[in-house]
Every structure is written in structure tokens, then in C-alpha cells.
Amino acid sequence: MAYKEVTRDELSAAGVQYGHQTKRWNPKMAPFIYGSKSKNHVIDLEKTLIQLRQAEKLVQSIGAKGEKVLFVGTRRSAKLAVKEAALRSGNYYVNQRWLGGTLTNFKTIVKRIKALWEIEESEKNGQLALRTKKEQILILKEKANLEKSLGGIKQMRKLPAALIVVDPKSDEIAVKEAIKLNIPVIGLCDTNVDPDIVTLPIPANDDLQESVNIMINALVDAFADGANLKLAPSVLKTVVVKRERTEGENNYSNNRSWNKPERTNN
């Protein structure tokens, strides 16, 4: 590959290895867990790299074919990453609430996208200014709502070749729609997620923005390599700044022993 592959040390610096509390785990994630510390699971970064490399090959091939991917991340930790990734690489994104039927009822979604295009065109050609003030307010309000829910996919004229989803558990509806249509799904799976619901799971922390950023950036770089694109550099942080943890956050003290999880046979 021509692009620079992310390393294990870089993943570690981004906090990719930090899983959820052991009591909140999904046993199907056992093959991807290194152990536990301070009552939190720790993800095996070697397994993360293996899965990431497979995902990179997939998105690289999609880029080489001139096709597009849809980034999905509606959680706070993912909103900026998926938007920046799509804008940098000419792909699509959803970072607000997933609209049911976005994929499975795409014809209806296209009609709503066209409504957004028409409003934008009326602004450009001056037709909107000819309407009454009341009508303009209502139309612009509709535009704002459409832009919020469809802005990231308003250039999507056909179904994407793949979905890249941050936290498939939170955006399970999007995952189910894609799987129903045989669209492959790459999912960043924390230790509380069922990895079987996606086509290609990548074990990774989905709460830290730095973790999400570095994983999404790695996939964008692979896509750009396949599509022969020169990307503008990402402005998002990929290194966790050490600070005092607030109550309820994952805490990994250095004086605790490591415990291996019970592995399943699955």
C-alpha cells in the first residue's frame, strides 16, 4: 500500500484499547479482548490491526472502482469524524438521527433530497425572494430541517458500496438496512457490541473521540489510495491527552494486575 499504515503504538496513543466495564461486555467480543484491568476490558490491538487491514483492503477496492461509502456515526464521539471523513474524501455521511428507510426506502429519501435541491436552487435564482416573508420563513425552516437530516447524503444518487459505522449497537437500524440489501458493513465494535451484526468488525473504543478519529482516518486513507485522491490533512486529534478522569469514565490504574477474559468457543 502506498499510504502510511497506522501502527500499534499510534492506536495505543489514541486509546483504542480501552473497553467498557467487564460487567457490560458482550461475550462474543471475547476473541478480540486481551484481558481486563481495573474492572474494564482491554482490547487486543493486534486483533484490531488484523481487522483494520481487512477493512482497509475493502475500502481501497471500493475507491479503485470509483464507488462511494457511507460513514455513519450519530454519537457525540463520532459526529465530527464521520463528517470530516466524508468531506475530505468525497463520500457521504450521517451524523444525526438515522432516518428509517434511508437505504431500504431510498426512492422516498431521494424525493426529499430533491426537495432540498429545489429550495437551494430557488435561493440561487432569486425565486425564493419573490415569495412573501411568511412563505420564506417556512421554506427556510424546511430547508434547515432537510439539511440537518439529509445534508450528508444530498449528493448520494445511488446506494453506497459499503457502510462504515461507529458503534453498530447505537446505529443498529442503519446496519440492519444495509445487511438486508447485501451492502457490506464495517463496524467499530467496542466490548459491549455484538460483532456478528456487521460484515467486518474492528474492535476499538467508540467513546473516545481520538480513538474514533484515528480509526476513521485510517479507513479514509485507504479509500483515497484506491481512488488515487490527494487528501487534505485531518484536523482532528488522534492522541489522548492525559487528564484527571471524571466519575463514571473508564479507569486503568497501573497497580492492578491483568486478568484474561474467559474465551468462548465461538
Curated annotation (Swiss-Prot):
UniProt GO MF annotations: structural constituent of ribosome
Keywords: Ribonucleoprotein, Ribosomal protein
Residue ranges with Polar residues bias: 249-258
InterPro entries xref list: Ribosomal_uS2, Ribosomal_uS2_bac/mit/plastid, Ribosomal_uS2_CS, Ribosomal_uS2_flav_dom_sf
A Pfam match: Ribosomal_S2
Gene Ontology terms: cellular component: small ribosomal subunit
GO term, biological process aspect, one: translation
Source superkingdom: Bacteria
Region (Disordered): 247-266
UniProt similarity note: Belongs to the universal ribosomal protein uS2 family.
Protein name: Small ribosomal subunit protein uS2
Recorded name of the encoding gene: rpsB
